[in-house]
Swiss-Prot record:
GO terms for molecular function: alanine-tRNA ligase activity; aminoacyl-tRNA deacylase activity; ATP binding; tRNA binding; zinc ion binding. The gene is alaS. Consists of three domains; the N-terminal catalytic domain, the editing domain and the C-terminal C-Ala domain. The editing domain removes incorrectly charged amino acids, while the C-Ala domain, along with tRNA(Ala), serves as a bridge to cooperatively bring together the editing and aminoacylation centers thus stimulating deacylation of misacylated tRNAs. Catalyzes the attachment of alanine to tRNA(Ala) in a two-step reaction: alanine is first activated by ATP to form Ala-AMP and then transferred to the acceptor end of tRNA(Ala). Also edits incorrectly charged Ser-tRNA(Ala) and Gly-tRNA(Ala) via its editing domain. It comes from the Bacteria. It is found in: Cytoplasm. CDD domains: AlaRS_core (cd00673). The keyword Nucleus does not apply. The keyword Nucleotide-binding applies. Zn(2+) binds at H562, H566, C664, H668. Its cofactor is Zn(2+). Keywords: Aminoacyl-tRNA synthetase, ATP-binding, Cytoplasm, Ligase, Metal-binding, Nucleotide-binding, Protein biosynthesis, RNA-binding, tRNA-binding, Zinc. This is Alanine--tRNA ligase. GO terms for biological process: alanyl-tRNA aminoacylation; negative regulation of DNA-templated transcription. It comes from Shewanella sp. (strain ANA-3).
């Protein structure tokens, strides 16, 4: 019963129809009334103006099965699609809505009844969350519904971010928002994961199936929370998730709709392994792409069309991975129409257009895909490290039409990180500072082919004689170079470390009688080490012998930072858990950057614990022991492997006491005590499930501490105290400021009351009604509401329109006494004026607000208000 997705959709809509809800068709994926949205991404989007009080429907209860796309802007799930059980670019959101009708108790009861009585889900498999301060919702669940208190979990805000909570819903930076309660389903203890709010909450055992939002506020661009005209309800339940539960499967990709699409894609392409993730990507993407085209979006290089192009091309590439040799994607449209049933009415009507658009884009992409993938493949094969530089990513995008997320997808399969920041500014220095310092393009490594080999002696020596075996100028092999040339010098043996494993290449000089070559970077070119730099004196030929001198100070500082990354890795695994693995690193003389897998921001207390643990190991002054052994033996000893690195049968193992053991080809200190001091300077997220720590060591750490101390002392001086009293004095100042703000508000209220008494005398009488139209000077926009309320009380039967022009903006408020709303509506009045000052607005019949961007037109606009009101009062 209700096991197919179509049956679930029908059951949901029928349940709410029978409970007084109007069944409303899904709106377009292109929002028609909201410039802040790229695509429709929630069921409530089409009702946004209703929630804001700017629109009114003939019903106060509604239910929908809304088509949604999340693949751009704030809500962007594209990177995870196909690789997780529940991420999609397209999904259907089942929802029920109350526009000032029922509120918390009925909303909760409807959800619980549908799940436990209609779908007959076991109550013991369900638990719920509420916003930390929402005692009302907690009591309803506990006292009215009968959910045990231990199965009601309070979820608070993220640290330092008010309202940034899984249980405080907000559509975007602005718009309707409010606390919410969520219902979770327990898939069973055979699946890893914990209850919401627990450290294991990101696991797949407990899955959110229904979110019930209590819409109470309208968030302004300033961050101010304005009460909505009437508290309302917005709920959402992804049909794919509930279908998975009803069909007895864990992954959304195993439900009937996806099974059919995956089977058809496999048939068209000619593959038999239905578990391949590429088939999941294709099955998901055909839904978003087909419905977007049906709703009028076409592939292009900007806006919505660009997002569509990205999704199509990602699907096509996955088809090519599976062996597709001709256009296949558009052939899935008939199957999609069949499995979507009633939800595909609009798609069926536009089937021919949809198929043509998808086929044309697929064929266009095929003409550039092969060449672009070849270039990307070459770049990745030549990559020294675990990060693809932004210049290469930009070249692929700019020259071959590759979206950055498609490049990221290819890199992900090879455990390579994409330098997205570097892509945005089209520069290569995000991966290596030395590449930016030289005059070589970011793809120089890919272009330069060196067959020679270079032996490395730099573990034990920082100087040594070597013979020049090759010279490269502007990417071409030459026999000699002259003073002033920027070139690459290849030696038979070198103490210079070539960039690898996150450690930057060494700098230094190559010298002989009358010859000096300044090395700005050292890179690997196959089995050779290329010394990149400038010949500053003399001339240099192949076959000459030079003395190679590594910059000892820079190498030493780099070694401090490299060795401490091993300690940091081990400390993170101890503090956060063994799920932590290295995802990338950058080690240079100035700092270290360490990327690692973790599902949430590292808490300040955890960071402190990690830092203390690392410094403890530094003080213990462990000897670093290095040993060569078979890779299997190293793994048996528990050695951690570096993310993305390729290893030979024999590997180098670096051990620090009983605290850390890793495979590593880099250079290190002799003892951990050489590091001196370790200080974390920042922690943040760089991708889904990947965090980044930046830190300093040695003298740089001491300088950082000194800077922090200096800032503390400066703050103490400003507060007229010592460093021990800074916190207490700052708290006292903040308390004083709050009191002053409170006193100021009270004064403003008194001034508003006084001003209202003066303003009331300016009212004119029209057909027995007090009419006040006034442009105010020196009044803050935030005071308009209170002033309008005061005036309505004084003037009794009245129509009021107040305007303020300040800082290039106009703020308007209209008020109409209840006895007059049948003749004059505040929303219509304020909208009329707003239209003349470059804005729009609306609200209730008795009170409405608006804004505008043309203060120079305010006087003219106000001059038209009295005739407008007089006409309606006649």
């Amino acid at each position: 019963m209700y096991q197919t997705t179509a049956a679930l959709r029908s059951a949901f809509l029928e349940f709410f129809r029978s409970n007084g809800h109007q069944v409303v068709d899904s709106s377009s994926l292109v929002p028609g009334n909201d410039p802040t949205l790229l695509f429709t991404n929630a069921g409530m989007n089409q009702f946004k103006d209703v929630f804001l009080g700017m629109d009114k429907r003939s019903y106060t209860r509604a239910t929908t099965a809304q088509r949604c796309v999340r693949a751009g802007g704030k809500h962007n799930d594209l990177d995870n699609v196909g690789y997780t059980a529940r991420h999609h670019t397209f999904f259907e959101m089942l929802g029920n809505f109350s526009f000032g009708d029922y509120f918390k108790e009925d909303a909760i009861r409807f959800g619980w009844t549908f799940l436990t009585e209609v779908l007959k889900l076991p109550k013991e498999r369900l638990c719920v969350t509420v916003y930390q301060t929402d005692d009302e919702a907690f009591e309803i669940w506990n006292k009215k519904i009968g959910v045990a208190a231990e199965n009601i979990i309070r979820i608070g805000d993220n640290k330092g971010a008010p309202y940034a909570s899984d249980n405080f819903w907000q559509m975007g930076d602005t718009g309707p928002c409010g606390p919410c309660t969520e219902i979770f389903y327990d898939h069973g203890d055979h699946i890893w994961g914990g209850r919401p709010g627990s450290p294991e909450e990101d696991g797949d055992r407990f899955i959110e199936i229904w979110n019930i939002v209590f819409m109470q506020y309208n968030r302004q661009a300033s961050g101010e929370m304005l009460p909505l005209p009437k508290p309302s309800v917005d709920t959402g339940m992804g049909i794919e998730r509930i279908a998975a539960i009803m069909q007895g499967v864990h992954s959304n990709y195993e439900i009937d709709i996806f099974r059919a699409l995956i089977a058809k894609a496999a048939e068209i392409i000619g593959v038999t392994d239905l578990s391949n993730k590429s088939l999941r990507v294709i099955a998901d993407h055909i839904r978003s792409c087909a419905f977007l085209v049906a709703d009028g979006v076409m592939p292009s290089n900007e806006g919505r069309g660009y997002v569509l192009r990205r999704i199509i091309r990602r699907a096509v590439r996955h088809g090519n991975k599976l062996g597709a040799t001709e256009a296949f994607f558009y052939k899935l449209v008939p199957t999609l129409i069949e499995v979507m049933g009633d939800a595909a009415k609009g798609l069926a009507d536009t089937q021919v257009i949809v198929e043509k658009a998808l086929k044309a884009e697929e064929e266009q992409f095929a003409r550039t895909l092969e060449r672009g993938l070849g270039i990307l493949d070459s770049a990745l094969n030549e990559l020294q490290g675990d990060t693809l530089d932004g210049e290469t990513v930009f070249k692929l995008y700019d020259t071959y039409g590759f979206p950055v997320d498609l490049t990221a997808d290819v890199c992900r399969e090879r455990n390579i990180i994409v330098d997205e920041a570097g892509f945005e500014v089209a520069m290569a220095e995000q991966r290596s500072r030395a590449q930016a310092a030289g005059n070589f393009g970011a793809d120089y490594n890919a272009a330069l082919k060196i067959d020679a080999e270079t032996a490395f002696c730099g573990y034990s020596e920082l100087t040594g004689n070597a013979k020049v075996t090759a010279l490269y100028l502007n990417g071409e092999s030459v026999s000699a170079i002259s003073a002033g040339d920027d070139a690459v010098v290849v030696l038979d043996v070198t103490p210079f470390y070539a960039e690898s494993g996150g450690q930057v290449g060494d700098k230094g000089v190559l010298v002989a009688q009358g010859i000096e070559f300044a090395v700005s970077d050292t890179q690997k070119f196959g089995q050779a080490s290329g010394h990149k730099g400038t010949l500053t004196a003399g001339s240099l030929s192949v076959g000459q012998v030079l003395e190679a001198k590594v910059d000892k100070k820079l190498r030493h500082r780099t070694q401090l930072n490299h060795s401490v990354t091993h300690l940091l890795h081990a400390a993170l695994r101890q503090v956060l858990g063994t799920h932590v693995t290295q995802k990338g690193s950058l080690v240079d003389p100035e700092r270290l950057r360490f990327d690692f897998s973790h599902f949430e921001a590292v808490k300040p207390a955890e960071l402190k614990q990690v830092e203390e643990l690392v410094n403890t190991q530094i003080r213990r002054n462990h000897e670093l022991k290095v040993a060569e052994m078979a890779i299997d033996e190293a793994k048996e000893k528990g050695a951690m492997a570096l993310f993305g690195e390729k290893y030979d049968a024999q590997v180098r193992v670096v051990t620090m006491g009983d605290f850390s053991i890793e495979l590593c080809g880099g250079t290190h200190v002799g003892r951990t005590g050489d590091i001196g001091l370790f200080k974390i300077t920042s922690e943040g997220g760089i991708a889904a499930g990947v965090r980044r720590i930046e830190a300093v060591t040695g003298a740089a750490a001491m300088a950082y501490v000194a800077q922090q101390q200096a800032q503390l002392e400066e703050a103490a001086a400003l507060l007229k105290g010592d460093t021990q009293s800074v916190v207490a004095k700052l708290k006292a100042q903040l308390d004083k400021m709050k009191q002053l703000e409170k006193d100021m508000q009270q004064l403003k209220d008194k001034l508003a009351a006084a001003a209202s008494a003066d303003l009331a005398g300016d009212a004119v009488v029209v057909n027995g009604v007090n009419v006040l139209i006034k442009k105010l000077e020196g009044v803050e926009a935030g005071a308009l509401r209170g002033l309008q309320d005061e005036l309505k009380q004084k003037l009794k039967s009245a129509v009021i329109l107040l305007g303020v022009a300040q800082e290039g903006k106009v703020n308007l408020i209209a008020g109409v006494s209840n006895d007059l709303v049948g003749k004059v509506k505040a929303g219509e009045l304020v909208a009329m004026v707003a239209a003349q000052v470059g804005g729009k607005g609306g609200g209730r019949p008795d009170m409405a607000q608006a804004g505008g961007s043309q203060p120079e037109n305010l006087d003219a606009a106000l001059s038209q208000v009295l005739p407008w009101i007089t006409e309606r009062l006649a």
